[in-house]
């Protein structure tokens, strides 16, 4: 989508990020970032905007994961509630100004409706581009070989992906212990 839009003179697109530089990339620390967001007709985000940024166009939230834990209003979040001023009110006020929420499947819609209730928010279970790409390419042997080579995987062993979810107050007991026996198997 983004490559197409860069070459389409009718769509002016900007990316607020420190990950890349160039004519369409603006650092979040740049003075113009706030104005670009607040004057855009469509804002696509994958997290929360700072409290002082108020977009006036349509806001599309690209949720960043599958909810395998309780979210926002369904979670206790004791650390945030105790240590961040007006945490829930500020976070909720950001959510009620979003128009669309992209999630990975119809099965998770009910969890988002419960955690982030809103009369305005339209939840779209259309998947995540990076996950959809891998699912659609699962039989692509050329891509598979390139990934295996790039990650320097041992092809004589099965692959184990361990990707724990983000938590605000992670402790050592939250992390699955990986034994030498397990590591040697994969």
Sequence positions of predicted segments:
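Conserved catalytic-core segment of nucleotide-activated headgroup transferases in glycan assembly
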Residues: 1, 5, 115, 125-186
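Active-site and donor-binding regions of nucleotide-sugar-utilizing enzymes
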Residues: 1-138
